[in-house]
Amino acid sequence: MSDTLASPSPETASGIPDYPMSRSAGCPFAPPPGVMALAAAKPLTRVRIWDGSTPWLITGYEQVRELFSDSRVSVDDRLPGFPHWNAGMLSTVHKRPRSVFTADGEEHTRFRRMLSKPFTFKRVEALRPTIQQITDEHIDAMLAGPQPADLVAKLALPVPSLVISQLLGVPYEDAEMFQHHANVGLARYATGADTVKGAMSLHKYLAELVEAKMANPAEDAVSDLAERVKAGELSVKEAAQLGTGLLIAGHETTANMIGLGVLALLVNPDQAGILRDAQDPKIVANAVEELLRYLSIIQNGQRRVAHEDIHIGGETIRAGEGIIIDLAPANWDAHAFTEPDRLYLHRAGAERNVAFGYGRHQCVGQQLARAELQIVYRTLLQRIPTLTLATALEDVPFKDDRLAYGVYELPVTW
């Protein structure tokens, strides 16, 4: 796959390349060749996005970690210069209450503290038997059904959806509804009208659920938020926004990682064998870290804006300029990882990947995602050792048009 590292980047008449960029059909797991060409030249550069603005694209591993940790960088998407993902996201920015995803400083700390309880290492470890049971039940159903089977529909999507539904206290029968509304705003060309409609529907649903949990609490995360509302620490709107974010992040990203990860393993059977034969949990854990590094499913950058001048990588990011922190080229940075374009599940230092971000804004649910991936990959390969792709790789429908990369379908046989 090393030929993907030197391809030219698309440029506008001004010489500033457009972003996002297209991936290579010949190597769908690699970051876009144009992005890798920019990264090979320098760790940050200007790019042009959908609205004509030219934020900084950060591709170097060290620079990514540095900016993730820099208090002069803001996640506040209301600030001028913030490089929004699409018109839909921009259109809803002043309609959404603040949340852990868009707050800085003490406000961010307050929100994160309110979300931390269900995602502690202890709570996640206690969930492992439940995740294992859900995984086994869906593999049982897949084995009992016809071939080929769509692994996305049969396993990759329902497992994390069920897990996050149970964790949050959201009825699973509503999963199709929240998946639909969540997906609307994640599309590259989502319109303002579509995004507003989806966001309002999800927010209304979560607000009503928070109010219901205030009257009848249970052992779940939405009930925890409801208790915060009753204590005067959160408004119902804030609690609903936090719950909405967890609901979207808790199933969409993990589902994509399961589907794309299984595909990567199927086209690298020697590496699949490492997971299939693994008895040591440490080997399984490291394999997941390497898959996270190799695939980096948040494919079009974590969005930020500078509120002070920042000198980094030989450039100066001025206050008010947008920043896009691209995880994929950072995780393929040859200065940080030897042979980065190679999937190697025994890789030393794989845990240094930035797939979940870095610093104070790194993913609050990362321990849950790791547990799900460890269980699903190993169980699937051990229970169905003859699992194979039922179509040509070039015929697999990839999510090139989404914020989170993955596959729409994954036909498999055994």
UniProtKB/Swiss-Prot annotation:
Comp. bias (Polar residues): 1-12
Enzyme superclass (EC): oxidoreductase
Any one GO MF annotation of this record: monooxygenase activity
Keywords: Heme, Iron, Metal-binding, Monooxygenase, Oxidoreductase
Residues holding heme: H108, Q302, R304, H361, C363
Region (Disordered): 1-21
E.C. number: 1.14.-.-
Domain of life: Bacteria
Cofactor(s) required for function per UniProt: heme
Family the UniProt entry places it in: Belongs to the cytochrome P450 family.
Function: Can bind oleic-acid derivatives, amphotericin B like precursors and a variety of nitrogen ligand donors.
The name this protein goes by in its record: Cytochrome P450 CYP105Q4
Species: Mycobacterium marinum (strain ATCC BAA-535 / M)
High-level lineage: Bacteria, Bacillati, Actinomycetota, Actinomycetes, Mycobacteriales
